[in-house]
Every structure is written in C-alpha cells, then in structure tokens.
Amino acid sequence: MTNTQNSKSIWTITPIMVITAIFCCVLWGSASPAIKIAYEVFKIDASDTASRLMLAGARFMLAGVMTVVFGSLISKKALIPQKSSWKYIAILSLFQTIGQYYFFFMSLANTSGVKGSIINASGNFFAPMFAIFLFRLEKPSVKKLIGCALGFAGIIMFFGGMGAITSGAPITFKGEGAMLCAAFFYAVSGCCIKIFSKYENPVILSGYQFALGGAVLFVIGLLSGGNLIFYSSGCYLNLIYMGFISAGAYTLWGVLLKYNPVSKVSVLGFVNPIMGVVLSALFLGEGQEAFSVLSLISLLLVSLGIVIVNYRKLEK
C-alpha cells in the first residue's frame, strides 16, 4: 500500500479513524455484559461448564464466519488460507480462542462485569512483557516498563493492594483468577499474531482460528453433556451480537491498522476497559462498584498505562 493510496482512503481521516477505533472498543467493552446477559437468557448456571463451552463455541464459530465474510467483502475476494497456514491457525486458535475464552467465560460466570473488565486489561501489559522477554519481538524501553507498572498498579489497587491480594480474600480462581488466565492467553496470542502475520493475512488468521477454536469448544461442551437451548428470540439476538463483537471489531481494527500507523490506532485501546466498566454499570446494574473512588482511580491507572505502553511519536 503506497502513501498515495493511503492518502485517498477515508480510514486515514483522523475523526473517522478515532470514531471507528472507539466503536471497536465499545464492541470489545460490551463483551462482558453481553456474556453475563447470555447466561441469563440461555439459563446457564454458573456451575454448568459444558453448556458454557457450547455457548462460547457457538459464538466463535459464528464470529469466524462473519470475519471471513466481512474480510472477503472488504478485500473484494474470497479469503482462503494457504495450506501452509493451517498450522498457524491451529496454534493461534489454541491460545486466542480455546484457552482465552475457556477462562473468560468461566470468569464471567463467577465475578462481576466491572471486575472482569479491569482485570482483563492486564493482557495489555502482559503482551509487551512477553514480546520483550519471551518472544524477543521488541526491545525493552523505560516507557513500556513504566506503562506496565502503572497498569498493574491499577489492577492491584482495585483489589485493595498487595496485602489484600496475598490474603486471598478478594480473589477466587474461578472468578478473578480465571480472567487473569484469559489475559495471559490473550497476550500470548497477540505475540503469535505478530509472528504469523508475516506469512498470512491477519484477517484470514483471525477468522479461521475463531471458527476452528469455536468448533473445538462447542464439541467439548457437547460431549461433556452440555445443552444450548434457544428459549426466545432474545437468545438468537444475543448470540448474533456476541459473534459480531469479535468479527466487527477485529475486521475494522485490522482495516485501521492497514491504513494508519500502528501507534496512532493502538493508543486508543485505553477506551476498551473504560467501556467495559461503563457498559457493565449500565446493563448489569453494577454502578456502585463501577463508579466507586477505588474503581475510578484503578481504571485511570490502567488506561494511562495502556496509553504509555502504546504511545509513539509519529514521524513527520
């Protein structure tokens, strides 16, 4: 893509880029309340792991189909992976969909949407740490270390400090601990995408890994005795929306990254946890927890950390 081509694209217009990025963050932020609402409309109990896996699987199979269709329409050609890419798709699905969302769906059955949104933001700080020290994809910098430190400080503060965390009182593995595991898998998958996208279109990787990972989760849930019963039209609408969350956000975000400097787009990711907290307050009735002084300070530190980690001066 040449600079001349970039300059002609509407996606390079700053207001459009910002609005689209924020829309993506609204979609991602709505995932926590959407999943908790899904448990209600599908009548899935917190202890029903098998049915929960079927719900997650159905969501991501649908998201995979949507992503490939949306991507094909934008590219004006069918997005089909190369034979050599299936190993990348399989590895990516293991981390980005199977691992991450096994724990993500577990967590939201056992904790609040507000807590889930703030803890899940830790993936933004695990990712650069893994990229620097584990995968050697980036060089360490004071700026990134400061950003990660601020972000983790915000998450620790949310639970009342290290003393409260080490006492074990505010954290359960099935709730907050599971969301931390989900963030871990998210960070690893982000590093995998950076590596694998050298060999395959990232939209193809995302779409097909969603579908593959979703199918695996669905089959595991089905074989484990789960049920996914559509009690009303609300069940269909909820599932379609959850599929669109991933497909719409990943597709649009990918388009923005294609036409703009990465840092100009990724720095707006700070909106994601904010939307998660706000939407949990609006749709789940968690306003008291969301707008407490402790939550707001924690959210400020987390968001500031994301900005610092991703901010880079743009070349003139």
Model-found features: residue ranges?
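Transmembrane alpha-helical segments that form core, pore/gating elements
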Residues: C25, K36, T67-V68, A127-M129, ...
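Specific transmembrane alpha-helical segments of multi-pass solute transporters/efflux pumps
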Residues: S72-G116, N120, M157, M242-N260
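Helix-helix packing/entry segments at the starts of transmembrane helices
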Residues: A58, T97, K115-S122, I193-A215, ...
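Transmembrane alpha-helices of multi-pass small-molecule transport proteins
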Residues: V41, D45-Q96, F126-F130, F185-S189, ...
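Glycine-/small-residue-enriched transmembrane alpha-helix faces in small-molecule transporters
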Residues: T2-M54, G168-I195, N238-L239, F244, ...
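Hydrophobic transmembrane alpha-helices of multi-pass small-molecule transport proteins
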Residues: T67, M129-F130, V142-M162, F270, ...
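Juxtamembrane helix-entry segments on the extracytoplasmic side of multipass membrane proteins
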Residues: I13-V18, D48-A50, P81-K87, M162-F185, ...
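Specific alpha-helical transmembrane segments that line the substrate/conduction pathway
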Residues: M54-G57, M61, V65, F105-K139, ...
